Amino acid sequence: MSSRPLTIGLVAGETSGDILGAGLIRALKEKVPGARFVGVAGPRMQAEGCEAWYEMEELAVMGIVEVLGRLPRLLKIRRDLTQRFSELQPDVFVGIDAPDFNITLEGNLKQHGINTIHYVSPSVWAWRQKRVFKIGKATNLVLAFLPFEKAFYDRFNVPCRFIGHTMADAMPLHPDKMTARATLGIAPDAHCLALLPGSRGAEVEMLSADFLNTAVLLRQHFPDLEIVVPLVNSKRREQFERIKSSVAPDLRVHLLDGQAREAMIASDAALLASGTAALECMLAKCPMVVGYRMKPFTFWLAQRLVKTPWVSLPNLLAGRELVTELLQTDCTPDKLAAALLPLFADTDKMAELRTTFVDLHQQIRCNADEQAAQAVLELVTPR
């Protein structure tokens, strides 16, 4: 047996992956206190002790058109990671999300005798379904946080473990709205809207103006409307402030550093980009509207590739439309405001929606960090 510590390679490509990676590292450190973690990491993973060869922001690119502009740099990083991990020979490599980057990297490393895990499943059930064969060749195991994903992989005999979602473990089934409001300085009886224009720079650039103009329309209906805008880091905050100064300079908003969860729990309704934020909003039991816009060519291509009728995780989990989705040309202030207005009403329909959110929460509350850590350790080969 080697005297070196258990060594885990990790690559996370965006904020949601950073959160998952940090939880996995915490759970592994509890089981193997001396373990070493190295790769591409965001601030949360680095805070847990992951050595970063590259910053996560290097990989955080959205859309096909946008990726093309960064392709030479991304390919150079992947070549370098392949070489460095192959030399290091970690006990296990875990690619966290970022499938277009990580799955090829996982395949490269598997060819060098390294056991690989992909965490979490890309949306192969929704589009580019033939990727399942590449994933099967590139990985020893897929970790999935949605129950229907494992059933999809089982059809193709690709090893997959349903572990639930870390956010479902971390959030209470019945969040305390008044405590969240007190934390954020929001009056108990005020109407409150959360705006979440995304974690990536391209999303914030594309969505902020429409989201701000929607808030302007809603304040005409609710003069007491409090608007909270959680932003993932200082870059996104500066970007949002720049857009706001030209679009809605007189609109009073609460800009928050992080605190997305508190903002969702405190709010009567949320307007957000699709992605992990929609799942978090569901777990916060906050009614929402999803608004999303891409570059025209990227959207044109997505329309032809996507195999599901919805893009947001609450709708996909429920198998029906719980949440209004307004995409591309439908993502306008008038339409967004019209969809948000009913969410502020204290009606039986809204109570029923929150009950459904609780039911879905329970389905994916499975102690995911612990399960993911156990899956990693089961793949460790004695040296």
Swiss-Prot record:
GO terms for molecular function: lipid-A-disaccharide synthase activity; phospholipid binding. It catalyses: 2-N,3-O-bis[(3R)-3-hydroxytetradecanoyl]-alpha-D-glucosaminyl 1-phosphate + UDP-2-N,3-O-bis[(3R)-3-hydroxytetradecanoyl]-alpha-D-glucosamine = lipid A disaccharide (E. coli) + UDP + H(+); a lipid X + a UDP-2-N,3-O-bis[(3R)-3-hydroxyacyl]-alpha-D-glucosamine = a lipid A disaccharide + UDP + H(+). Condensation of UDP-2,3-diacylglucosamine and 2,3-diacylglucosamine-1-phosphate to form lipid A disaccharide, a precursor of lipid A, a phosphorylated glycolipid that anchors the lipopolysaccharide to the outer membrane of the cell. Belongs to the LpxB family. It comes from Pectobacterium atrosepticum (strain SCRI 1043 / ATCC BAA-672) (Erwinia carotovora subsp. atroseptica). CDD domains: Glycosyltransferase_GTB-type (cd01635). This is Lipid-A-disaccharide synthase. Pfam families: LpxB (PF02684). The keyword Protein biosynthesis does not apply. GO terms for biological process: lipid A biosynthetic process. InterPro entries: Glyco_trans_19. Keywords: Glycosyltransferase, Lipid A biosynthesis, Lipid biosynthesis, Lipid metabolism, Transferase. Transmembrane segments: none annotated. Pathway: Glycolipid biosynthesis; lipid IV(A) biosynthesis; lipid IV(A) from (3R)-3-hydroxytetradecanoyl-[acyl-carrier-protein] and UDP-N-acetyl-alpha-D-glucosamine: step 5/6. Its EC number is 2.4.1.182. One of its GO terms (cellular component) is membrane.
